[in-house]
């Protein structure tokens, strides 16, 4: 399994998306406005899902304890995916959560919402994908409802056990049932693309190369 995750991490989303299309999975890309904090950032691995909802200042609950519960349950090697639900103003992730997640062995985070402490997160090199930035704390605005459960981000349903690959071009969810097939098929195509790329750079003809390798 670790070898397969390593192979997934060496691939890129465009190649994986093509394979998913060929296998009939046409709706696996998260919203296109979820972007990496730095262009070079990449995430790959099994998902750890988090679902939240808006809260009010005076509801008498300190949501930070629930946040700590969520952090304690992160499996080593997982990529955290946060769906904030109906809260669109606060930062749902920050520096201290990042450092705690690193302690737990998390490989990155994808948030369909807000991020703060961006420079500090860049300093520790934790791959983070987010929709927007906000200085506002989530403590008075947002609760974590549940984690490690099925969630929906945009139009994509994500199940515990699924896999994620994210890079500068976007974030893809790969269902657990087909992960091995997707990786193996994409590696085979990527090998052909490497040959075609080298041939083109050496003056090859794209039509002839396409007829031979069927990649373009």
What are these language model-derived features?
Residues 1-160, 174-216:
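Feature captures the catalytic cores and cofactor-binding loops of soluble hydro-lyases/lyases
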């Amino acid at each position: 399994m670790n070898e397969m995750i390593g192979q997934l991490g060496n691939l890129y989303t465009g190649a994986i998306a093509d394979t998913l299309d060929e296998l009939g999975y046409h709706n696996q890309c998260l919203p296109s406005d979820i972007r990496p904090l730095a262009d070079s950032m990449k995430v790959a691995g099994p998902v750890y899902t988090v679902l939240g909802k808006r809260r009010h200042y005076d509801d008498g609950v300190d949501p930070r304890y629930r946040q700590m519960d969520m952090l304690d349950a992160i499996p080593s090697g997982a990529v955290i995916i946060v769906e904030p639900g109906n809260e669109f103003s606060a930062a749902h992730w920050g520096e201290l959560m990042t450092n705690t997640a690193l302690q737990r062995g998390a490989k990155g985070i994808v948030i369909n919402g807000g991020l703060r402490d961006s420079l500090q997160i860049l300093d520790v090199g934790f791959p983070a994908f987010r929709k927007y930035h906000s200085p506002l704390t989530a403590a008075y605005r947002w609760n974590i409802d549940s984690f490690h459960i099925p969630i929906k981000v945009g139009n994509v349903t994500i199940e515990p056990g699924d896999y994620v690959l994210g890079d500068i071009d976007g974030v893809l969810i790969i269902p657990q049932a087909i992960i091995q097939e997707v990786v193996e098929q994409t590696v085979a195509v990527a090998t052909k693309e490497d040959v075609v790329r080298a041939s083109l750079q050496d003056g090859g003809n794209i039509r002839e190369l396409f007829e031979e390798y069927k990649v373009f």
